[in-house]
């Protein structure tokens, strides 16, 4: 039993090479009777650059320990995001968390990652090469990351939309061409 678990963990580590990015470190203080006890909080983004990404938060008395805890937390919270042609999003999407709002837009090849701060780290670890993103409201890294993840969880591939509607992918795309032709007339 234990041997199976170890073998599975080894296989997962070998198959999944993750890239991690440290987004934010915060020094926090706990006031106790004898003064202040300082600690550190870390926010880390982890991804495989093939459509899986997660974020984690870790706290500890030392910075490396906080980063390690955050990385482990991020690996446990991975989500899969469908990518178009392995380089961009399928459609434009909005997300929010608290007072932070983000707009993510699919972009043509060669655009690059046009996003600020924590959002850029999310896209780099996710494996997106072309995207335009804008954040509004809160510039707190935690809120920006959570708003970005909220938007990414609302991302649907044409295949999943077609399955939900009981259609074929080609029928979805033919409807889109008809609507585009009517709009230009």
Swiss-Prot record:
GO biological process, one term: translation
Any one of the GO CC terms: small ribosomal subunit
Gene3D superfamilies referenced in this protein's UniProt entry, alphabetically: 3.30.160.20, 3.30.230.10
Gene Ontology MF, one: structural constituent of ribosome
Keyword Lipid biosynthesis: no
Residues forming coiled coils: none
PANTHER family: MITOCHONDRIAL RIBOSOMAL PROTEIN S5
Similarity remark: Belongs to the universal ribosomal protein uS5 family.
Function, in words: With S4 and S12 plays an important role in translational accuracy. Located at the back of the 30S subunit body where it stabilizes the conformation of the head with respect to the body.
Domains (record comment): The N-terminal domain interacts with the head of the 30S subunit; the C-terminal domain interacts with the body and contacts protein S4. The interaction surface between S4 and S5 is involved in control of translational fidelity.
Official protein name in the record: Small ribosomal subunit protein uS5
């Amino acid at each position: 039993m234990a041997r199976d678990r170890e073998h599975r963990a080894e296989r997962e580590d070998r198959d999944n090479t993750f890239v991690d990015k440290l987004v934010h470190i915060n020094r926090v203080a706990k006031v106790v009777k004898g003064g202040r006890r300082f600690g550190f909080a870390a926010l880390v983004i982890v991804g495989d650059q093939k459509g899986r990404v997660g974020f984690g938060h870790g706290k500890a008395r030392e910075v490396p320990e906080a980063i390690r805890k955050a990385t482990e937390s991020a690996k446990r919270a991975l989500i899969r995001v469908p990518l178009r042609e392995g380089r961009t999003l399928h459609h434009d999407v909005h997300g929010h968390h608290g007072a932070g709002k983000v707009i993510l837009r699919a972009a043509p090849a060669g655009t690059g990652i046009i996003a600020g701060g924590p959002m850029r780290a999310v896209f780099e670890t996710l494996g997106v090469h072309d995207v335009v993103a804008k954040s509004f409201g809160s510039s707190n890294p935690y809120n920006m990351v959570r708003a970005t993840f909220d938007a990414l969880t609302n991302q649907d591939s044409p295949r999943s939309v077609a399955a939900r509607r009981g259609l074929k992918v080609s029928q979805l795309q033919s409807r889109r061409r008809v609507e585009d032709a009517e709009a230009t007339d």
